[in-house]
Amino acid sequence: MSKPPRDYARIGTNTYFVTASAWGHRSLFQSERIASLLINTLSHYRSAQKYLLHEFVIMPNHIHLMFTPSEITLERAMQFVKGGFSYRVKKELGIDAEVWARGYVDHRIRDQNDYERHLSYVRNNPVKAGLVKLAEEYPYSSAREGIELDPRPQGLKPRIMKTA
């Protein structure tokens, strides 16, 4: 009997913070055409209900996502994002080159405090990198207006407030 996927028991219930880098850490995503295509790809798979998309930022050489895969494993969701985007780059832009570095780094969001910490990191990444002064000014981020996102995941443990 084959071994179930790593996230089998928790499919559709875990929210992740994921970082994926461009091949060779090139600044591939600073191109407006490429960044827009990546946003379109993220939106496409969100609309196809492959995942709930909570936040994202596309930096010049990497991306950060906060999402909850729907009825699929994290690995499969990332295959949609990375593989789907690579296919579209080659087909629609005629760029026949490696797009992504192998793998990705993931962290399962554990509670509301963890969610807020990663949300702040995603939103402020372009500010911290000196690309903009305000997160809302960065064009390739869910912090700007007009980006359709899914609500905060349900079922996160409440934040524990420390009292004096």
Q: What positions do the PLM features span?
A:
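Short catalytic/metal-binding and nucleic-acid-binding patches
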Residues: 1-164
